[in-house]
Amino acid sequence: MIKQYLQVTKPGIIFGNLISVIGGFLLAAQGRIDYPLFLATLVGVSLVVASGCVFNNVIDRDIDKKMERTKNRVLVKGLISLKVTLVYASLLGIAGFALLYVAANPLAMWLAVMGFVVYVGVYSLYMKRHSVYGTLIGSLSGAAPPVIGYCAVSNQFDAGALILLLIFSLWQMPHSYAIAIFRFKDYQAANIPVLPVVKGISVAKNHITLYIVAFAIATLMLSLGGYAGYKYLIVAAAVSVWWLGMALSGYKNAIDDRVWARKLFVFSIVAITSLSVMMSVDSMAPAHEVLLTYLR
């Protein structure tokens, strides 16, 4: 039973978000780490993300039964009652919001609320089922965790927070489109209007390429704005160029789109993890030492 309650929170998504929270937090901390705040932020965001995932499982149970990848999920098989699941999700969310408010600051809590509302209320309940722009809206909620981590320390939404929002939102797009391509039949069967299904895979490839270019520019802004150092800059540039090269390889005539998309998806995880690690490590230089000053 405990395993089922854990599964419904989507632990993989929680773990992925924690990596980005750590990146945002340590970027803002600049080497001066408040460990109680760090722990509280990680736990608070984890609880909020878990709550959102449980609510998403409730909302998507009719869709999940149509998809090969999700047909064996806990709620699809009726292993937990709907009423208990809703109470469980609510308690997780309340605990997460309360912890962020008390242990971090109101800004971090309200950012978590906004991310939660966008994911559950806007994306899951409506946009995912009715609009090709659902992925774009969902990307905003996916970018919330690193911004929460950053603002838990800074207690302000500054240029650094905005750049993080851009980086992680732009990353979500090619990442999500890649999933939709190699899981094309699942999305088609569930009648989910993702771009590859609605507009075709060739159009999706164009969007993927453009979003990766935009992502690359956004990642460089973190160094050029003085929030991360040259080591981060080198890794960001290398990761972006490699990811773009992989995207461009998708235009070859003999390419297997499903295999290509899966590789692109896997590398997207490598890319964002690398950036999260590097912004954590290379943020320990003096705050706001603008890289451009070294180039004059």
UniProtKB/Swiss-Prot annotation:
Any one GO CC term of the record: plasma membrane
Transmembrane segment boundaries: 11-31, 35-55, 84-104, 107-127, 132-152, 162-182, 208-228, 229-249, 264-284
EC number: 2.5.1.141
GO molecular function terms attached to this record: protoheme IX farnesyltransferase activity
UniProt topology in membrane: Multi-pass membrane protein
EC primary class: transferase
Catalysis: reaction(s): heme b + (2E,6E)-farnesyl diphosphate + H2O = Fe(II)-heme o + diphosphate
Keywords in alphabetical order: Cell inner membrane, Cell membrane, Heme biosynthesis, Membrane, Transferase, Transmembrane, Transmembrane helix
Chief location of this protein within or outside the cell: membrane
Pfam hit, one: UbiA
Compartments where located: Cell inner membrane
Pathway where it operates: Porphyrin-containing compound metabolism; heme O biosynthesis; heme O from protoheme: step 1/1
InterPro entries xrefs: Protohaem_IX_farnesylTrfase, UbiA_prenyltransferase, UbiA_prenylTrfase_CS, UbiA_sf
NCBIfam families recorded: cyoE_ctaB, PRK04375.1-1
Misc remark: Carbon 2 of the heme B porphyrin ring is defined according to the Fischer nomenclature.
HAMAP family: CyoE_CtaB (MF_00154)
Entry similarity comment: Belongs to the UbiA prenyltransferase family. Protoheme IX farnesyltransferase subfamily.
Chain's role: Converts heme B (protoheme IX) to heme O by substitution of the vinyl group on carbon 2 of heme B porphyrin ring with a hydroxyethyl farnesyl side group.
The protein, known as: Protoheme IX farnesyltransferase
